[in-house]
Amino acid sequence: MAKVALIQRELKREKLVAKYAKKYVQLKAIAGDAKRSDAEREAARLGLQKLPRNANPTRQRNRCAITGRPRGTFRQFGLARAKIREMAFAGDIPGITKASW
């Protein structure tokens, strides 16, 4: 089980990313547009630098919804591999069965 503080920090990052998402996308588009003037592109880069660090979506980490484990998390389920295994064997995830051939 991950520390509660780490899970809360990740939730805080999610909120910041959502809050600045529109502005971030607009500034990235301007900064990457070769048709714009150098001054406009530089202003967009400075605008990106002024955003909070945690507003950058690449700083987010996928975590297990139950345990908060940061590694071995399957996007499809939002769970860590160990929890998927436990829940699959218990029959809590519909359509998942143990492989046998």
Swiss-Prot record:
Molecular function, one GO term: structural constituent of ribosome
Family matches, as Gene3D superfamilies: 1.10.287.1480
GO BP: translation
Pfam families registered for this protein in UniProt: Ribosomal_S14
Region feature (Disordered): 32-62
Compositional bias annotation for Basic and acidic residues: 33-44
Keyword list, A-Z: Ribonucleoprotein, Ribosomal protein, RNA-binding, rRNA-binding
UniProt KW Ribonucleoprotein keyword: yes
Gene Ontology CC terms, in alphabetical order: cytoplasm; small ribosomal subunit
Family: Belongs to the universal ribosomal protein uS14 family.
Subunit structure: Part of the 30S ribosomal subunit. Contacts proteins S3 and S10.
HAMAP family registered for this protein in UniProt: Ribosomal_uS14_1 (MF_00537)
Task performed by this protein: Binds 16S rRNA, required for the assembly of 30S particles and may also be responsible for determining the conformation of the 16S rRNA at the A site.
Protein name from the UniProt record: Small ribosomal subunit protein uS14
Taxonomic path: Bacteria, Pseudomonadati, Pseudomonadota, Betaproteobacteria, Burkholderiales
